[in-house]
Each structure stands twice: as structure tokens, then as C-alpha cells.
Swiss-Prot record:
Catalyzes the cross-linking of a glutamate residue and a tyrosine residue in the PqqA protein as part of the biosynthesis of pyrroloquinoline quinone (PQQ). This is PqqA peptide cyclase. [4Fe-4S] cluster binds at residues 22, 26, 29. SMART domains: Elp3. Its cofactor is [4Fe-4S] cluster. The gene is pqqE. Keywords: 4Fe-4S, Iron, Iron-sulfur, Metal-binding, Oxidoreductase, PQQ biosynthesis, S-adenosyl-L-methionine. One of its GO terms (molecular function) is iron ion binding.
């Protein structure tokens, strides 16, 4: 083993992407563009076996995601199995399809945590972004129902150029709903968000205003005794150093797609790397021995300027998926880094954002028809 290759720890966090089915059409969805090609889903028994193997390896947190995980009728059974194995369980949902009776069933099964996503602070923009006119009122009702059952009230808003200027109203809504934690996550440009980047990336001025709004509310809320935690995540497109993506490749996080492909991050399936299936190999073998999970572990794979950089142990060379999307090779330095020879790609994106006039209605919305059209066009 190379002296530059650190010991491999077990995956602490397992993300179960139960399905790509979803009633919404968000144009910033992180699901793959060709999700419509993925028709198969793991069975209840197969998912439980994945949970069992992950727990035996040392995983402690399990997220149920999608698509919309509520479309799986076996969700209570999966929650119960995960709880019986000792996982801390988190449901990541749009709230569409959620009912009070389902909440009661999830509680009885042992679900620990629910995170509900909103698209905006008002019904009109929420409907335009979600592609569902009834979504906003349903989300409000379910957020209140979650709070009434003493779950931690966790709300998520994906921010972009079309809703970031209403950030004060978003925070006011969170206060009204008595949220405990609020994730104000500026759009991360993978999947459908990358396809729509020119129409979604906020300007630098919008980001600066948003940072001030969050700072002002944190101060006011602290003064009034409101303990709501506001987590504001800015886009790395306006940073000069890359993020330490997923805490390092194959270091903490393991994702399993609906049909069973194991990934070191939920965007990695787009890379020209063969990732194994949980139906063909054990999770232990996948995590420790597979080529895909070892491809970008440690530092030996790094090109210059990453290899000799004194910050490599902090950012791990940045995001491999972002490097691939922007440069065509996942081996390259993340273009976010000002030291990268490809940093001009980020500068170009900033310039595009500064002059973009793309409206919400002009975005490419995530739906099965559009997905089928995209992959058929790419096969020509």
C-alpha cells in the first residue's frame, strides 16, 4: 500500500435511493438525466439485505431518498428493518404523498427524522418550480403534522436565481412553521441542475445579499431566543478553493441507486468508471476492494497542482464529478480551484450568470418524457 494512501474506514452514512419515481418536476433535481432508463428497483428483501450488510460494516445513519421515497409502499417495512438493525433513520421527502396516517405508521416503525423540501416561500413560484399547483399547501400541512408528532422540524429550500431574493420570506415561513433546522442550500450543479445551470446559478450580488439576510436573521433570532438553526450553503462556483466533496472519495458516504448500483456519491454514476452492483458483490467487497471505490481514494491519483498542494488533505482535490462535467476528465483538478488550469470554466459560468435572462418557464424540467428524449437524442 502506498504511504500516501490512508487506511479505509467503514461507510458511516448510507443513502438508499429507493426509487427515481417522483410526482414533482424540479429543474434542479440531482437525479441522473437518463433516470427514465432505470426501470428496475430493488425488492424489499434486497434493500433489507443491503441495510444488514452496511450495519455490519459499521454504518450508523441511513437516509431514505429518491425520487420520492413515499412512492414505495414498503417504506414502513424498510424503516422498521433499519430501526431494528440499529440505524438512525432519516426520510428525505417532498411531502407529496405524505399523510397523517403514514406519519403515524412511520413513527410506529421507528423513523427518527423527517426532512421536507420546499421550492419557494409562496404558492405561485413553488408551483412553477415543482410542476404541481397543489404542492405548496400539501407541504405546509405535512410540515405542521410532522411538528405535531414531535419529530425534529427540518426544512430544506434549494436556492437559485429565481427564489434567492425572497430569502427573507423563506426564513419567515420557517419561523412560522417552528422549524428546528433549516437548510438553505444553494443549488449544487449536478444532474438536472447542471443542465439548467445558466438559468439557475445566482449572481455574485445575489449571493452577497443572501449572506447578509441570513446573518441579520441569525442575529435577530438569537436576540429573541429563537433557537432555529439556519444552515446556508453557498455554491462553490463563487469560491476559489473546492469543497472537500463527501469528506473524501469512498471515505464516509455510500449511496445505492434504485436498481442496486453502489456509488461513492450520488452523482458518480455519470463517470466513465464501472461501479458494482449490490446484487453481484457484497457491500464489504464493494467498499474495500472494488476499482470504482478505490479509483480516487487517497492522494496517489492526483495530478499537479493537486499532488504537491498543501491543501490536499482538506479538499481531497475537490469534486471528481464536477471535474468530469466541466473538463471531460474526472482526473483533472476541480475547476473551482483558482490553481486549476481549468478555472476559466468557472469564470465563464459566472459571466453567464451575470447576464442570464432565462425565466422559470424556460428551464428544462425533470420528468420522464424529457429524460427519455435526452437519452434518445444522445444515442443518435
Amino acid at each position: 500500500m502506498s504511504q500516501n494512501k490512508p487506511a479505509v474506514n467503514p461507510p458511516l452514512w448510507l443513502l438508499a435511493e429507493l426509487t427515481y419515481r417522483c410526482p414533482l418536476q424540479c429543474p434542479y433535481c440531482s437525479n441522473p438525466l437518463d433516470f427514465a432508463r432505470q426501470e428496475k428497483e430493488l425488492t424489499t428483501e434486497q434493500w433489507i439485505e443491503v441495510f444488514r450488510q452496511a450495519r455490519a460494516m459499521g454504518s450508523v445513519q441511513l437516509g431514505f431518498s429518491g425520487g420520492e421515497p413515499l412512492t414505495r409502499k414498503d417504506l414502513p417495512e424498510l424503516i422498521r428493518a433499519a430501526r431494528d438493525l440499529g440505524f438512525y433513520t432519516n426520510l428525505i421527502t417532498s411531502g407529496i404523498g405524505l399523510t397523517e396516517s403514514k406519519l403515524d405508521a412511520f413513527s410506529e416503525a421507528g423513523l427518527d427524522h423527517i426532512q421536507i423540501s420546499f421550492q419557494a416561500s409562496d404558492e405561485v413560484l413553488n408551483a412553477a418550480l415543482a410542476g404541481n399547483k397543489k404542492a405548496f399547501q400539501q407541504k405546509l400541512a405535512m410540515a405542521r403534522a410532522v411538528k405535531a408528532r414531535d419529530y425534529p422540524m427540518v426544512l430544506n429550500f434549494v436556492l437559485h436565481r429565481h427564489n434567492i431574493d425572497q430569502l427573507d420570506k423563506i426564513i419567515e415561513l420557517c419561523i412560522e412553521l417552528e422549524a428546528d433546522d433549516v437548510e438553505l442550500a444553494t443549488c449544487q450543479f449536478y444532474g438536472w441542475a447542471f443542465l439548467n445551470r445558466e438559468g439557475l446559478l445566482p449572481t455574485r450580488e445575489q449571493i452577497a445579499r443572501a449572506e447578509q439576510v441570513v446573518a441579520d436573521y441569525r442575529q435577530k433570532m438569537a436576540a429573541s431566543g429563537n433557537l432555529t438553526n439556519l444552515l446556508f450553503v453557498t455554491p462553490d462556483y463563487y469560491e476559489e478553493r473546492p469543497k472537500g466533496c463527501m469528506g473524501g472519495w469512498g471515505s464516509i458516504f455510500l449511496s445505492v441507486t434504485p436498481e442496486g448500483t453502489a456509488l461513492p456519491c450520488h452523482s458518480a454514476r455519470q463517470l466513465p468508471v464501472a461501479f458494482p452492483s449490490v446484487l453481484e458483490q457484497s457491500l464489504e467487497s464493494i467498499w474495500y476492494d472494488s476499482f470504482g471505490f478505490n479509483r480516487y481514494r487517497g492522494y496517489d491519483w492526483m495530478p499537479e497542482p493537486c499532488r504537491s498542494c498543501d491543501e490536499k488533505e482538506k479538499d481531497f482535490g475537490g469534486c471528481r464529478c464536477q471535474a468530469f462535467m466541466l473538463t471531460g476528465s474526472a482526473d483533472n483538478a476541480d475547476p473551482v480551484c483558482s490553481k486549476s488550469p481549468h478555472h476559466h470554466k468557472i469564470l465563464e459560468a459566472r459571466r453567464e450568470a451575470a447576464c442570464s435572462d432565462i425565466k422559470v418557464s424556460q428551464l428544462q424540467f425533470r420528468n420522464r418524457t424529457r429524460s427519455q428524449l435526452i437519452y434518445k437524442t444522445r444515442e443518435l
